[in-house]
Structures are given as structure tokens and as C-alpha cells.
């Protein structure tokens, strides 16, 4: 009986790991004002194409600020006024990856950027 319980517990742990949602951002760096950066967010653990995705950011000492969002198909995009015309959100559903192209960067764009489901 002990063995059986251990086996069930192990299966439960493995199932939990398999279903875990992971969002891993990359692409940040130092850039001068007026420069460009492209952020990427690799997603796993869910059906990526079924969900709208967003980018949010947190400037030093400030709260979270929504930056941009994109529909599951990629057909609709939305932007905060502060980044409109400078940032472009996109996604590649075949790669389960979300992108944020940031151009004409300003000092006030300095922040930690997060992707969100």
C-alpha cells in the first residue's frame, strides 16, 4: 500500500510540472535614447494561440503599467498612449513566442518588462 501511495504522489507531481505555465522573457539590455530593442517571451504549459497576451512594465520605484496587448490570432493589437507609434507587439504562434519591438526609446521607458497571459 505504501508503494501505491508513493506512485500516485509521483504521478501527481509529474502532472503538475507538465501543466505549469511558464513565460520566459529575454532581449533586454542597455541602449541609448533613440535606440531600439526587441523583447521576446517564450511561453509553455498552455495553448498559446488561444490566449491574448500582454506586456506590462515596472519603472524603478513605481507600480505596474500596462504597455501593449495582442489577440490570440495576432489580428488585433492595443497600445498605451505612452508607447503608441514607437512600440510594436507581435506573436509567432508556431513558436509560442511573444515579441515587443521597441523603437525611439526614451529615458522614461526604463523599466522591468514582463509578458502576461
Curated annotation (Swiss-Prot):
Disulfide bonds join 41-115. Keywords: Adaptive immunity, Cell membrane, Disulfide bond, Immunity, Immunoglobulin, Immunoglobulin domain, Membrane, Secreted, Signal. Residues 116-117 are annotated as: Complementarity-determining-3. Residues 20-117 form the Ig-like domain. One of its GO terms (cellular component) is extracellular region. PROSITE patterns: IG_LIKE. Residues 1-19 form the signal peptide. The keyword Transmembrane helix does not apply. Residues 53-69 are annotated as: Framework-2. Residues 20-44 are annotated as: Framework-1. Pfam families: V-set. Residues 45-52 are annotated as: Complementarity-determining-1. Residues 70-77 are annotated as: Complementarity-determining-2. Residues 78-115 are annotated as: Framework-3. GO terms for molecular function: antigen binding. Its main location: secreted. InterPro entries: Ig-like_dom (IPR007110), Ig-like_dom_sf (IPR036179), Ig-like_fold (IPR013783), Ig_V-set (IPR013106), IgHV (IPR050199). It is found in: Secreted; Cell membrane. GO terms for biological process: immune response; immunoglobulin mediated immune response. V region of the variable domain of immunoglobulin heavy chains that participates in the antigen recognition. Immunoglobulins, also known as antibodies, are membrane-bound or secreted glycoproteins produced by B lymphocytes. In the recognition phase of humoral immunity, the membrane-bound immunoglobulins serve as receptors which, upon binding of a specific antigen, trigger the clonal expansion and differentiation of B lymphocytes into immunoglobulins-secreting plasma cells. Immunoglobulins are composed of two identical heavy chains and two identical light chains; disulfide-linked. This is Immunoglobulin heavy variable 3-23. It comes from Homo sapiens.
Amino acid at each position: 500500500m505504501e508503494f501505491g501511495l508513493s506512485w500516485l504522489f509521483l504521478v501527481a507531481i509529474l502532472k503538475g510540472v507538465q501543466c505549469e505555465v511558464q513565460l520566459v522573457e529575454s532581449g533586454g539590455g542597455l541602449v541609448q535614447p533613440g535606440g531600439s530593442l526587441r523583447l521576446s517571451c517564450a511561453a509553455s504549459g498552455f495553448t498559446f494561440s488561444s490566449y491574448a497576451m500582454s506586456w506590462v512594465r515596472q519603472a524603478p520605484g513605481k507600480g505596474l503599467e500596462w504597455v501593449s496587448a495582442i489577440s490570440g490570432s495576432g489580428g488585433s493589437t492595443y497600445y498605451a498612449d505612452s508607447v503608441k507609434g514607437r512600440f510594436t507587439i507581435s506573436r509567432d504562434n508556431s513558436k509560442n513566442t511573444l515579441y515587443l519591438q521597441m523603437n525611439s526609446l526614451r529615458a522614461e521607458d526604463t523599466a522591468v518588462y514582463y509578458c502576461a497571459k
